[in-house]
Amino acid sequence: FDEEVHNIKRSFNISLAKAIRSAGLDHLKYEAMCEYASLDEEALEEMRSAGYYKIRFGIETGSDKVAEKMTLGKKHDLDKLRSMVKFGKSLGMLIYGTISIGGLGSSREEDQKTVDLVYEMASKGWLDEIQVSINTPQPGTDFYNSCVEKSLLSPATNWEGFDGNGQVVVHYPHYPAEEIQSSFKKALSAFDLGKEKSQSGTFSENAKSSFNLIPEGARVLVLRSVRNWMVRLILENLNNNVDLLGQDVSAKDLEGLAGLNQIHSYGSGFFSAESISTDLIEKLRNEQYDFILVPVANNHLQGFQNV
């Protein structure tokens, strides 16, 4: 259910959940975009019993000032957000949060409140997935018209930059594009740091158990197929020095770590036969590794029950 109005009318929301159960369709798995301000515990319980496994919340911002400028009104209530997320997690639901950076009323200080909120929720294990967007004015909206009137749009920006996915098209005098871009990256990093805090203990325990199968002195190649904090924990828990195959950007962050011999960097993008050059493939073959370690962060396919 990919519309935020899915749960706006409480009676409809609960009736739909009951109808799903009555029709015998509660064995299926449902994901829904919901407005957290319109939810309550009873509605969440009914949804969970009907097969809902993941809720997507439009968190948007951790700043009251930005929320006011974005005219979020009653849809912005951080105490209610925390309450609903915590209760949803107690029911075993997955929580997906969407936030935006650089909107009207934002500044480095105000967007830092959003960054802090992301870290708080992730570090408590409340936030399973996140979508971070740069607040981008779309033609026809009040935001866009306001930016045009105040000459806040970069004249060099083409329409491909209006996707909110890492490109900044608005330049505030007090909050330049470079700082907005920095806040965007901080929000993504805050999620990673929070997940590391909440999951590192369990991850290390599982890693130690798995690595008992690898004899000391074995030649090991690790694929950088998980977040960098997981790679660091792998290196800490292995009894062997290893080589790493990964992307250029991750190599810069990981080089010099204890337990890491050399990094084979293939450029950018996901692992595939097309993304790795034939010369590098031949070099890896000549290394004659005893083990190739492919870390998987989601080996239970959490979040994909509906597939």
How would you name each of these model-derived features?
Residues D2, G58, S133, Y266, ...:
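Conserved residues at the C-terminal ends of beta-strands
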Residues E31, R56, Y96-T98, Q131, ...:
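A structural signal for isolated positions on well-ordered beta-strands in alpha/beta enzyme cores
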Residues E46-I55, Q112-I134, L257-G269:
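Structural recognition of alpha->loop->beta junctions
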Residues K89, M93-T98, R108, M121-K124:
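Conserved beta-strand->loop/alpha-helix structural units within folded catalytic cores of enzymes
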Residues E109-S210:
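C-terminal accessory regions of radical SAM enzymes
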Residues S210-V220:
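A short, charged/proline- and glycine-enriched loop
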Residues R219-V307:
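Active-site and donor-binding regions of nucleotide-sugar-utilizing enzymes
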